[in-house]
Amino acid sequence: AILRIRTRTKPITVAQRHKRRRTILDKLTRHPKMQLARMDDVAGCRLIFNSVAELYEFRGSFQKARFNHRRRHDLDKYDYIKQPKETGYRGIHDVYEYDVRSAAGRALAGLYVEIQYRTLVQHAWATAVEVIGFITESQPKFQRGDNRYEDAMALASEILARSEEGLNGPFP
């Protein structure tokens, strides 16, 4: 509810996101000590902004908002805009522990919810990576398969970061 209220009058796209079953099982296989109940990115939402400046401005004001949900990590831990992944992924992930006082919501207390922040350019790039996974035998998102896709997408991320956002991507 707090996100709906804060984004209502702003040019921000808000979308629910649920991790696909296959992706959950894959993550549990890759990280055998992980428990499904403690997986922090199964449910959440994605906020898509027109610019990096708007993204950081909104996130900064949201961090100062008064609510009971608790961010589970340091502010910059999952800031992949400042520190892009080698794959070229850029965006920010904040994980909150859901805290609700109402009787109706009590069953959800303690649930981890992820908020992803991306620009439209970053979202388009991430969507292209997903599409490659759907139409080829490769999974560049997980660094599996033909590494030419990974290399091409990392370069594409760098080009987009520099040309569209005035930032660096995964390359120095």
Residues covered by each model-derived region:
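Short Gly/Thr-rich strand-loop-strand
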Residues: 62, 67-105
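Surface-exposed, low-hydrophobicity interaction/linker segments
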Residues: 1-30
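Hydrophobic side chains in well-ordered alpha-helices
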Residues: 55-61
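A short, structural micro-pattern
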Residues: 39-41, 86-90, 107-111
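An acidic, glycine-/histidine-flanked metal-binding catalytic module
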Residues: 1, 106-172
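Helix N-cap motif at beta-to-alpha junctions
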Residues: 50-54
